[in-house]
Amino acid sequence: MELTTPGVAATVAVLFGIVVTGAFHEDGLADTADAMGGWTPERRREILKDSRHGSYGVAAMCGTIVLRIACIAALAPAAAFAALVAAHTLGRGAAVGVMGLAPPVSTDGLGADYARSLTRSRTVTGVAGALAITALATGWWVGPFAVAALISAVMVAAVARRAFGGVSGDILGAVEQVAECAILVVATGLASRHPLWW
C-alpha cells in the first residue's frame, strides 16, 4: 500500500536533501546563474561574491528543483531510490573532479581553500568512491550515469573558465546541481525504455 502519491514523495525527497545540505549547492547554482548576467569576467566575479539572489538565480534554483521532482516522481520507488543515490553521489563526485582539475577563480574563498588541500590522488579517490557507491546502487547502469555526470561537469567547467576565468565554490555548487539533474533525466529516459534498468 502506498502511503502517498509519487509527486508528494518526490517533493519530500528533494526537500529533505536541500534541508540536510543547507541548500549549499542550490545557493551556488543561484549565485552562478546571477553572475552569468555580467558583461565582463570582472563584473561576473563581482556579482558572484554578492550573496543576494536575482531573477536568474531564483529561476535556475526553482527550475532545477522542479526538474528533479518531476524526474523522481516518474520513477518506480526502487528505481527512484537508485537514481537518487546515483544523482547525489555522482553529483558530488563531479564537483570534486572539477575542483581538483580546474583552475580557481581566485585564491580566496571556501572553494579555493578546499582546492589547495585537494591533491590529484585525493581527487581520484573521491571520484572513484562516488563511482563505486553508485555501482553498488545501480549495477552496470553506473555507466550512463557517469557519462551524464562527466559531460555536464565538463560543460559547466568550460563555461565557467570562459566566463569567470576559473571555478569557485559557487561554481562547484552549479556543477553538482547540473550533474544531479542530468543523471535524473537519464534515469527517467532509461526507465521509460527498460523497466528493470536498475
Summary of predicted features, one role per range:
Residues M1-G22, A33-E46, D50-W198:
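Hydrophobic alpha-helical transmembrane segments
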